[in-house]
Amino acid sequence: MAQAVDWDRTWATDRERMELAVELSRQNVEHRTGGPFGAAIFERSGRLVGVGVNSVVRLDNSALHAEMVAFMMAQHRAGSFTLAAPGQPPHELFTSCEPCAMCLGAALWSGISRLVFGASGEDVRDLGFDEGPVFPQSHQYLAERGIGIEGGLLRAEACGVLRRYRELQGPLYNRVPAV
């Protein structure tokens, strides 16, 4: 997916940045290369520094959520384990869906200053994925540590990708337990 991205472009608006995250998720579903999740990390100026798509099933690795892949790429390109290292500009994560418990934890340690998501965790659970222990306090914890969180940007478009994944009968590897 990284090959299909215009790395020289300045992504000026939140909408443009989220459009990229949703498009990455859509391509991942249409190419049947992974789950319906895409993420991108930008410097606040709009410079793209990392992208990721869900590759859990394809690469047999439960950690390869879109956000985790984007964090790995961005930190590698920054030459630091944290995007908040001295001399680094503020970084922002745009992700097609609200992050799961693992990705929220990684967001805390990644060094991002802002997290923006499209579809909600409830939208993802309705598809059948189990997102783990994500609570309102999870978002509050990040906010108290200086990470701004905004949800619902291009939610309808992100939910369209989730519906398409269901139509194509994509695998649900972390299923919501039956009650």
Language-model regions: role of each:
Residues 100-103:
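Short cysteine clusters
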Residues 37-43:
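Short beta-strand scaffold segments in enzyme catalytic cores
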Residues 84-97:
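Immediate flanking context of iron-sulfur cluster ligation sites
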Residues 56-69:
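A short, polar/charged loop-to-alpha-helix boundary motif
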Residues 1-28, 89, 106, 110-179:
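Zinc-dependent deaminase
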